[in-house]
Amino acid sequence: MTNIRKTHPLMKIVNNAFIDLPTPPNISLWWNFGSLLGICLILQILTGLFLAMHYSSDTTTAFSSVTHICRDVNYGWIIRYMHANGASMFFICLFMHVGRGLYYGSYTFLETWNIGVVLLFATMATAFMGYVLPWGQMSFWGATVITNLLSAIPYIGTNLVEWIWGGFSVDKATLTRFFAFHFILPFIITATAMVHLLFLHEMGSNNPTGIPSDMDKIPFHPYYTIKDILGAMLLILTLILLVLFTPDLLGDPDNYTPANPLSTPPHIKPEWYFLFAYAILRSIPNKLGGVLALVLSILILAIVPLLHTSKQRSMMFRPISQCLFWTLVADLLALTWIGGQPVEYPYIIIGQLASIMYFFIILVLMPVAGTIENNLLKW
């Protein structure tokens, strides 16, 4: 008798995706982050659901409703901090996942890669709107500054901003709609992630060498399920340590002050995972130029496949490209640091140099390095 998991219409889908899936035998720990992102997403939806049961999306009660969750709701504090720090873990996994794709040339799977870029944008939008909900000082001013950037769009900019605000400033209408979008987007992300997975399984996983492994595949279960469980345990351990020992480590103290439209915080800055993009935005003195650079800093990922000049897929055997890749990582860390610093000398010039380096490495140096490596190997 055939196993039910291979015949039942629903079980068959699960079986083909997580049990009998043919997988390369040599994929490393860098391939764990996809499943970790799935775990993060489920965790965020669950904790978010319980927070939404107690949250009030009104400007007069939003801040106190979050305080109420932390003080009066059973284990509300742990749910709130799991959600806040879960977002940080989510972005750590996202950056690692994207970095893996860049290093090992996974971007040659065009559909999977482009859906991944859409997922990254959707996750960033969700995180931004979630940051506004506690209605602290940084929530309010972050929302004001970032939504205001749209006013740089010629002709329709001002109308667009007021349309998003639902008025002439960030107010009750803005908070309510941000809550609505923050609630619905994770479900859209879940559906998109399934499409991401569907396209991935159409072609099969890449592996560290970048060489097709079709003739040498192993089943996903038990080999990679056990590996994913190890990754999940490490992720949850890290998250629990963060939540129980230093829950406010990655947050901003200004967000413990209720939103006040009459008092601007000395330094307006987003959460740490947006600082690199914020630094790129600030490094350009022109408003529209800054907004374009901000969007392009993420959208550049979509054109990475067009810039691939090497005849090898992975960077595993390409030392020049490896050096450039790790320079890019260091540059992103520098941008993250600069994004959190005040706008004054020497931070301005460092930010401008780091921003130029970011685009120069991706658009110029990496394609050139690929061509040089081809010539060195006489290909």
From Swiss-Prot:
Belongs to the cytochrome b family. Heme b b566 binds at H97, H196. The cytochrome bc1 complex contains 11 subunits: 3 respiratory subunits (MT-CYB, CYC1 and UQCRFS1), 2 core proteins (UQCRC1 and UQCRC2) and 6 low-molecular weight proteins (UQCRH/QCR6, UQCRB/QCR7, UQCRQ/QCR8, UQCR10/QCR9, UQCR11/QCR10 and a cleavage product of UQCRFS1). This cytochrome bc1 complex then forms a dimer. Keywords: Electron transport, Heme, Iron, Membrane, Metal-binding, Mitochondrion, Mitochondrion inner membrane, Respiratory chain, Transmembrane, Transmembrane helix, Transport, Ubiquinone. InterPro entries: Cyt_b/b6_C, Cyt_b/b6_C_sf, Cyt_b/b6_N, Cytb/b6-like_sf, Cytochrome_b, Cytochrome_b_C_euk/bac, Cytochrome_b_N_euk/bac, Di-haem_cyt_TM. Binds 2 heme b groups non-covalently. This is Cytochrome b. Heme b b562 binds at H83, H182. It is a multi-pass membrane protein. GO terms for cellular component: mitochondrial inner membrane; respiratory chain complex III. Heme 1 (or BL or b562) is low-potential and absorbs at about 562 nm, and heme 2 (or BH or b566) is high-potential and absorbs at about 566 nm. Component of the ubiquinol-cytochrome c reductase complex (complex III or cytochrome b-c1 complex) that is part of the mitochondrial respiratory chain. The b-c1 complex mediates electron transfer from ubiquinol to cytochrome c. Contributes to the generation of a proton gradient across the mitochondrial membrane that is then used for ATP synthesis. A ubiquinone binds at H201. Its main location: mitochondrion. GO terms for biological process: mitochondrial electron transport, ubiquinol to cytochrome c. It is found in: Mitochondrion inner membrane. The chain crosses the membrane at residues 33-53, 77-98, 113-133, 178-198, 226-246, 288-308, 320-340, 347-367. GO terms for molecular function: metal ion binding; ubiquinol-cytochrome-c reductase activity.
